[in-house]
Amino acid sequence: MPIFLSLYISNMSRSIWGPATWYLLHCMVLKIDDNIQRPVLEDLKNMIYIVISNLPCPMCSNHAVSYFGAHQYTRISTLEQLRFFIYSFHEDVNKRLKKTSALSYAEHVLYYQPFNLSMVIKNVIQIYENMNNTNVTMMMYSFHRRRMVSDLDQYFRKHASLYRA
């Protein structure tokens, strides 16, 4: 895909899908039970990877996947490590976008804790389902995003009892 098309699509709606996706990622790791078992942690990590691999901006997804690989995402073995990883990832993206973040790790936990998880999920699903792509290449990405939304729904149905609203 031409770089200008990717930039146009990413800038066109990043202000909408970007914050919604960050709320989702932070809430996924902060609102889950602190005592989850290893298989649940792996499910969570897999779902997060699916989300970042299917962002509405292919260039953003490529950066995210590269970051996860370079920072050994697969080696994360505790929930606390995963929580800090998502925080650090968000900070890295903010730096790359020349945005300033005034939140320490502890402040970010306090910031995201009050969010209503079911509303965050509904918002993400609504945003991702309502993106229209007319370009053939972008339609392929749209297909994968729809699959991601379905996977996300299944993930939360399976693990609903482990999450605080």
Spans of model-derived segments:
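Aromatic-rich, lipid-facing transmembrane alpha helices and their immediate juxtamembrane interface loops
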Residues: 1-165
